[in-house]
Regions:
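Charge-rich, low-complexity N-terminal segments
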Residues: 1-134
């Protein structure tokens, strides 16, 4: 399986509900480093997994929807703990929707087998969501 990864970052504010979260129950900020890895079984006619520039732009567009927001005030996350794990899945879903809409060019999204999204809270802690695209 071939893969191509792009990375970016975003900043949010949020809080959690539940004693398991300790002091993170209070409003706090987070800066996430994000990696999106696109995978396919064979390379395209140009020898690529996908256009790296389009992949980077697509990731940036998805993260711009979240950047500098207080997620506690976002209607789409009402009643949810926006944990690192949850956000990895949410970014995956948003990227997958853009892939289905053709954001990486004609036929590229259809050729991709899977996508993996990694959110890094720090150099020693991260979460990921991975899923098939076909």
């Amino acid at each position: 399986m071939y893969s191509l990864a792009v990375s970016s970052h975003f900043m949010i504010a949020h809080s959690f509900v539940g004693e398991v979260f300790g002091p993170a129950q209070q409003l706090h900020g987070a800066t996430y480093a994000v990696e999106a890895e696109f995978r396919r079984a064979t390379l395209d006619a140009s020898g690529l997994v996908c256009d790296i520039g389009l992949a980077a732009a697509m990731l940036k567009a998805v993260l711009d929807e979240l950047d500098f927001r207080n997620l506690d005030e976002a209607a789409e996350f009402s009643g949810r703990n926006t944990t690192t794990e949850f956000l990895a899945g949410e970014i995956f879903r948003r990227l997958a929707a853009r892939l289905r809409a053709g954001a990486l060019g004609s036929g590229t999204g259809d050729a991709l087998a899977s996508l993996r999204v990694v959110l890094r809270e720090s150099p020693v802690a991260w979460a990921a969501f991975e899923g098939a695209l076909a």
